[in-house]
């Protein structure tokens, strides 16, 4: 689960649909990755693209720190 990314998305008002459009995938795929519903994470290139386009003022390591679901 990418809790930091989820929190910052809410603050910056960025949607799963916007991330999906940037990455060329469905919003549900983005949601599943961010919420930890799948074992797959973001590819490094995709994480860099998300950070550069939507969250340039936040560190990549902060945004994409994985947290385990309880």
Regions found by a protein language model. Give the residues of each.
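Short, charged recognition helix plus adjacent turn
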Residues: 13, 27, 32, 59-70
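A short, basic/aromatic helix-end/turn motif that makes direct DNA contacts
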Residues: 22-25, 55
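Recognition helix of helix-turn-helix/homeodomain-like DNA-binding domains
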Residues: 25-41
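Short, basic-rich loop-to-helix N-cap that marks the start of a DNA-contacting helix
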Residues: 37-52
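Short, charge-rich amphipathic interface segments used for partner binding and complex assembly
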Residues: 48-62
